[in-house]
Amino acid sequence: MTDKLTEICDTKRNEVAARKGAVTVSELTARASEQSAPRGFEKALRGKAAEGFALIAEIKKASPSKGLIRPDFRPADHARAYQAGGAACLSVLTDAPYFQGHEDFLVEARAACTLPVIRKDFMVDPWQCLEARAIGADAILIIVAALSDQQMAEIEAAALEQGMDALVEVHNEEEMERAARLRSRLIGVNNRDLKRFVTDLATTERLAPLAPDGTLLVAESGINTHADLLRLEKCGARTFLVGESLMRQADVEAATRGLLFG
């Protein structure tokens, strides 16, 4: 695990331990049962990717490497703009210490649109899957670099039990091999090197041929233009996760449309 990722996950484990003490499993289960059914995150992506480009548009206020990204941060407005611009799904950052995220941002975004939403956070405990469903998440993220094979399998099983999908994120060949051992065939390639925090679209191009049969490959990070989508389509990627380059635009809807359709 990279140093920054180790630090973030250590912080997250302490945070989860504290939250576990503040709410019972039965309370979370009750909240989860009150939520509307999962909206079908992977299904929505596969449907869009079958006819064109599928976009997971990210609602992100800040990041450790870039600081504040969107000063006038309004999750509900951004969600509506992304949907109007043609996004297939949303990603909402809920990590507070490093990304200035919050659970409420996901709740607000999901209520403002009809798109499936992934809770973008650092999953270190299966308990977080129940918590994610309790706030309405339709999918969760599994970062291979942050977890052992057993931890990944347990978190994936907990997500599936709640009817959610799991986006499995990799950055190199070894992680792709480990991701293939899971049931999920929704695999994201992070083009950002978490050790050096530089991005290179060639990462997706290199790893795409190694994805297991039946995989819906998601290219993540460093994607800024329609030309980037056309480049990555050549290696088989038709699904993309984009946040920062869209969140920095004054007109998010127009920027989303421009990214998808040129």
UniProtKB/Swiss-Prot annotation:
Keywords: Amino-acid biosynthesis, Aromatic amino acid biosynthesis, Decarboxylase, Lyase, Tryptophan biosynthesis. It catalyses: 1-(2-carboxyphenylamino)-1-deoxy-D-ribulose 5-phosphate + H(+) = (1S,2R)-1-C-(indol-3-yl)glycerol 3-phosphate + CO2 + H2O. PANTHER family: INDOLE-3-GLYCEROL-PHOSPHATE SYNTHASE, TRYPTOPHAN BIOSYNTHESIS PROTEIN. InterPro entries: Aldolase_TIM, Indole-3-glycerol_P_synth, Indole-3-glycerol_P_synth_dom, Indole-3-GlycerolPSynthase_CS, RibuloseP-bd_barrel. SUPFAM superfamilies: Ribulose-phoshate binding barrel. GO terms for biological process: L-tryptophan biosynthetic process. It is an enzyme of class 4 (lyase). This is Indole-3-glycerol phosphate synthase. Its EC number is 4.1.1.48. It holds the Pfam family IGPS. Pathway: Amino-acid biosynthesis; L-tryptophan biosynthesis; L-tryptophan from chorismate: step 4/5. HAMAP family: IGPS_B. It comes from the Bacteria. One of its GO terms (molecular function) is indole-3-glycerol-phosphate synthase activity. Belongs to the TrpC family.
